[in-house]
Regions:
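Rossmann-like NAD(P)H-binding beta-loop-alpha module
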Residues: 171-213
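Conserved hydrophobic packing residues within short motifs/helices of P-loop NTPase cores
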Residues: 9-11, 32, 142, 178, ...
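Beta1/beta-strand and adjacent pyrophosphate-binding region of the FAD-binding site
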Residues: 2-14, 173-183
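Glycine-rich flavin
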Residues: 2-6, 22-29, 34-173, 206-210, ...
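Short beta-strands and strand-loop turn motifs
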Residues: 83, 202-206, 233-235
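Glycine-centered short loops/turns at secondary-structure junctions
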Residues: 28, 197-199, 229
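Internal, well-ordered alpha-helical segments in soluble enzyme and binding-protein domains
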Residues: 185, 189, 217, 221, ...
Length: 240
């Protein structure tokens, strides 16, 4: 088998792709994984992991500022260093990316950075910074993941209308923030920035936050969010 011939070529290096790559390699296959952007995918780089890091940091800030005095703990003036908070988040991401690189190295998985395209049966073209390579594959697995959904009446402009990706990397705390969508991602972002001082309004088209969740639990969560300063407007839509 040549250097560019593989038993399995996986397009996408997110949680589905990199786990499949390691497992296939354990089973004796020669494996390549292709991704145009992030090793670890959206979840690790601009989704689940950084959002949880900011949720933890913002919770500690919120408790230090508003909650510890009830326990007889006085800290004086509590200052927010958003740059340091974001730096911690990035360090966590970097550490986990290094872990995946180590996983690939330990399992002898070849990693190609570029856009992977299935050009014909058993052929994957990888367009990277150094040109195009064509990988031969007995099997091809598509694990391309997802991207933030853009609403027709609220197109992303990177400034006033942003996706969760930008919301995880803001350089200053916005004075006001409208979150369109009361699902898990929207509520996480709203909670983070409300704890850090933003006036947050969550707009949800359905009649409860977290549609599909037990209604009583969703109601309890709504009350907790309200105490943190997050207002939820249900049965409503938004437009610029």
């Amino acid at each position: 088998m040549s250097d560019l011939s593989f038993d399995l070529v996986i397009i996408g290096a997110g949680p589905g792709g990199y786990v499949a790559a390691a497992k296939a390699a354990e089973l004796g296959m020669k494996v390549a994984c292709v991704d145009k952007s992030y090793l670890g995918g959206t979840c690790l780089n601009v989704g689940c992991i950084p959002s949880k890091a900011l949720l933890e940091s913002s919770e500690l800030y919120y408790k230090a500022k508003k909650g510890l005095d009830r326990h007889g703990i006085g800290l004086g003036e509590v200052a927010l260093d958003l740059g340091a908070m974001m730096g911690r988040k990035e360090k966590i991401v970097e550490t986990m990316v290094k872990g995946i690189k180590g996983l690939f190295k330990g399992h002898d998985v070849s990693y190609f950075v570029g856009t992977g395209t299935v050009v014909e049966a058993g052929k994957v073209a990888v367009a990277g910074a150094d040109g195009e390579q064509v990988l031969a594959a007995k099997h091809i697995l598509l694990a391309t993941g997802s991207a933030p959904a853009e609403l027709p009446n609220l197109p992303f402009d990177g400034e006033r209308v942003i996706s969760s990706t930008e919301a995880l990397a803001l350089q200053e705390v916005p004075e006001r923030l409208v979150v369109v969508g009361g699902g898990a991602i929207g509520l996480e972002m709203g909670s983070v920035w409300a704890r850090l001082g933003s006036e947050v309004l969550v707009v949800e088209l359905m009649d409860q936050i977290l549609p599909g969740m037990d209604r009583e639990m969703a109601g309890q969560l709504g009350r907790l969010l309200k105490r943190q300063g997050v207002e939820c407007r249900l049965g409503a839509s938004a437009q610029v």
